[in-house]
Amino acid sequence: MLNIYPRFLLAQLHMDSLATKGTRKAVKEALKSPPNDLSRTYDEAMQRIESQNDDDRQLAERVLYWISYALRPLTVEELQHALAVEPGESKLDEDNIPDEELLTSLCAGLVIVDKESNIIRLVHYTTQEYFNSIRASRFPGAQTSIASTCLTYLSFEVFADGYY
């Protein structure tokens, strides 16, 4: 039973890829050589992310590196706050918090939200394995960015008064 889920995941990610094809010819070409392993499928999802406009690509990459480097599962709100933190600011700008649906839609099917726990996570444990193998080269400044964001967040004025 455990081996069945990755096959459905592979099919779902392939369907997501086909949905982005602009012409029938592009769909036919993609159907001629469907990805037969998850690593290739994840590579193709990353290519779809790379083809987005700069703002969307950067946000998707930030979502992916925050989730893949997190030492514990993050709630949607935690990730939204992390992504909204701006260097040098003394408080969180509520207008800079990205929408939950945007966070998942930009990530080419690689990220889902568990509606019961409100945890935003990678779609499958194999996705985490994939990112474990590529994240250092794919997101070279991620750990520095995460550390900087955490330090900025902890230095917000709201924490100076001891009320949070």
Task: Tell where the protein language model's regions lie, with residue ranges.
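Short conserved motifs of the RecA-like P-loop NTPase core
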Residues: 1
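Leucine/isoleucine-rich amphipathic helices and adjacent mixed helix/strand linkers
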Residues: 5-164
